[in-house]
Amino acid sequence: MVSLTTLKAIKLTPGLVARFLVLPIHKVKNPCIYCPGICLASCPTFVNTGNMVLSPLGYARFPNLAREKCLKCWLCVYECPVEFPLPDTFNKEPVVLEEVSYKPGGIILVADQDIDVELASILSDKLGTGLLVIRGIKNRYIHGGPIDEKSVKKIKKRLAKAELALAVSPETAHTLNINPLILKLPALGVKVSYAGPVHIPCLLRKYKDELLDALEKLGVALTSINEECVKLSMKKDVLYLCPEAKNRGGKVVYDLLLSSMSTH
């Protein structure tokens, strides 16, 4: 684990940002190579190991290593003053999204075939919503790479027919830039019973305040917030919001939701 001394040394200051921003960013393919490490303290693999190679600075220089070791959590992008999408550079071949199946509805749940299709199918039936299942998203968060924009437009065109499109997984919400289902659950009139720590997914960090508000309305009594990446660490006493955590043996909010709905 990286030392606190190192983390304190990597501090974002106005001067540091100013020096970075005067670089001809628009002329370089990867500004991370010229960056002094503004985002390092946000990188889980760097914080966990203290190894500079296993950080955005290393991943920017060694894409083959990045495809294997980077968690594709996008936290570095959120910290970057120019929001450079480093994980998109790890593969040159764009990730193409494909429609697998479609069930119409006023509200459409969107799921990935390889992440959360079984869970989404059950939720769709229980909540009485439509369901769009696509393929391709999971690969983006395993190996990295840009999204094929033409395929995204096709998916968005399909979703435009619905009143509301909601992503079951953080990966889908992030890729398609649509709201995560958890934000709208209170409006659907469902409740859960839980008191304890809650995990905020890396890819949903921008929704943090909204997520906490939605969870409170759902009936969650929050005692603390966990923000460790599920690809590095899982805890038995934490409630997770992402289906990926369920695949890793974690307690997921959707399990509580389905259990609650089955008793009513």
Please name every model-derived segment.
Residues 2-15, 21-29, 86-264:
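Iron-sulfur cluster-binding electron-transfer modules in prokaryotic oxidoreductases
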Residues 33-65, 69-95:
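Iron-sulfur cluster-binding cysteine motifs and their immediate structural context
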